[in-house]
Amino acid sequence: MIDFHCSKRHKDMTPIVKDTDIQEYAETLLRDYKPKLLQEPGKVNPIHFVEAYLDAVVDYQDIYYPDDEPAIAGATLFNDDHILVFDREAKRIKPIEVAANTVLIDNSTMADGKEGFATFTVLHEGGHLCLHPAVYRRMGGQLSLFDSHKDGDSVVCCRRSSLEGGGSKRAKLTTQTDFREHQANVFAASIAMPRSTFTPAAQEMIRNCGFRDGVFVMPDVMDWDYSLGVSAIEESLSSLFGVSKAAANVQMKRLGLLMTEEQYLVQHRQFAVAF
């Protein structure tokens, strides 16, 4: 595994980086792990990547969360610690010991029909392991902050709503927790859908829909034909890369392959000024 380095951090040690920095780092890992994934479209095995390459352990539990809080999709532990789970047999909540460098995936995330979201969740937690040890890992002698749920705790619990494909619209990034979740999302997308294979695959599908420059432009007014066209592309990319349609949609937007008319016109005006 190749360590992540950045020159600028927030006072809580959250990396201050651009999406492209994370994309390049993820692609460096893929080049070291399995170069073929950068050469032709395919599905990464998220469990093998996290366990064999990142040297972590993946486990599955019914992670406890209060009824009035969003569901947890996964968690990452940077130190030996305890986490609350729901014991279905005893029908009670109990703490369990979990070793450092463990990725916990909630059993609901692994339900049939959610394979794409499960892949993204495992890789998202792998992103935290790679990008955020300086934030969460405690050195010897430090007290556990697990029960206080403060930033800097050695356990990061990721809400389903914070993951791409988790069913919520992208929120504004305001807190350092928001930025870390976003960074883990970018990492997961870059491992599952690297630019070198995702972009040409998506552009071929987009051109087949009549967009010669390989950018799918959605009209500012709702149009069912365009929506169905995008949905078909998302479905194909989802099948090709083993991700959810929602994750494929976000990656298309992130890479400038899916835009609104207004976004497209603004970009082309910028190009015209530049040249």
Model-assigned labels for residue ranges:
Residues 1-275:
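Active-site hotspot residues in diverse enzymes, especially metal/ion-binding acidic/histidine motifs
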